[in-house]
């Protein structure tokens, strides 16, 4: 399982946002019980999402967010990617730091 999450919870969360422009980060994290994950698990999850190991999640990495949970999941639309980035980008630098990602999950 990804970051210690329950596979059935993750499958339900992915199914709920299968349609384009239906992704809502709060609903996804709630369905997957990600908010119950420890801060260490959240940092590990963010580090796994950080494909280029920059310490940040850039828009191209956020776009592929769902595929980290299931290879067959769709990419996020540009609108979904921008909405998730803006929701978590506390310092306005256009990227999510790993700490910002952990805060976003807990919202």
UniProtKB/Swiss-Prot annotation:
Residues the record lists as binding Ca(2+) 2: 89, 91, 93, 95, 100
Record keywords: Acetylation, Allergen, Calcium, Metal-binding, Muscle protein, Repeat
InterPro entries from the UniProt entry: EF-hand-dom_pair (IPR011992), EF_Hand_1_Ca_BS (IPR018247), EF_hand_dom (IPR002048), Parvalbumin (IPR008080)
Domain of life: Eukaryota
Cellular component terms (Gene Ontology): sarcoplasm
Pfam families linked: EF-hand_7
Residue ranges of every copy of the EF-hand domain listed in the record: 37-72, 89-107
Function as written in the Swiss-Prot or TrEMBL entry: In muscle, parvalbumin is thought to be involved in relaxation after contraction. It binds two calcium ions.
Recorded family membership: Belongs to the parvalbumin family.
Protein's name in the database: Parvalbumin beta 2
Protein source organism: Oncorhynchus mykiss
């Amino acid at each position: 399982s990804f970051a210690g999450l329950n596979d059935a919870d993750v499958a339900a969360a992915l199914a709920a946002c299968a349609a384009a422009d239906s992704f809502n980060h709060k609903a996804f994290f709630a369905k997957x019980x990600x908010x119950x994950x420890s801060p260490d698990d959240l940092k590990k999850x963010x580090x796994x999402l950080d494909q280029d190991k920059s310490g940040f999640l850039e828009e191209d990495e956020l776009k592929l967010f769902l595929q980290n949970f299931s290879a067959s999941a769709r990419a996020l639309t540009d609108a979904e990617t921008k909405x998730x980035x803006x929701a978590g980008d506390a310092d306005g630098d256009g990227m999510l730091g790993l700490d910002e990602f952990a805060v976003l999950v807990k919202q």
